[in-house]
Amino acid sequence: MGRPPKCRRVEFIPQCTYFKPAGIPLWNLEEVGLAVEEVEALRLKDLEGLEQEDCAERMGISRPTFQRILTGARSKVAQALVTGRAIRVEGGNFEYVARRLRCTGCRAEWEPDPSDLNEQQCPKCGGKELMTRPERCSRPKRGAGKYRVPKKR
């Protein structure tokens, strides 16, 4: 028996979850299901143009796993476009992680609007040189609380 799939990190939840070809009535329409993490893989690789290693790191998975997710997503989208099927985005094994940006000029931090995929700029100074704030580890540091400072005699 295989192990359960690892939970994937997702920074964007799509607001439009159903795409239908024009001219085909709903009762006569077949669907292709696309998981939320598959949409995230398409967004990171094809829309943001990141390298696979960076995409995999942001999703918290290995490169081969990212490649499998991306290949499956592209195959499903191509199948829907070629055969005239609807695309339904739902489900998957993921956790939503809000991404924070930091301006390199004024060091302001904010959470970008997930529906706005255009080029971001700092709301405080208008700067365009931004970086993603590094994730902070929620675990205590190694050895924290184990050592005591010896008392002076």
UniProtKB/Swiss-Prot annotation:
Residues 139-153 have a biased composition (Basic residues). It holds the Pfam family DUF134. Residues 129-138 have a biased composition (Basic and acidic residues). Disulfide bonds: none annotated. Residues 129-153 are annotated as: Disordered. It comes from the Bacteria. InterPro entries: RNA_pol_sigma_r3/r4-like, UPF0251, WH-like_DNA-bd_sf. Belongs to the UPF0251 family. This is UPF0251 protein Daud_0090.
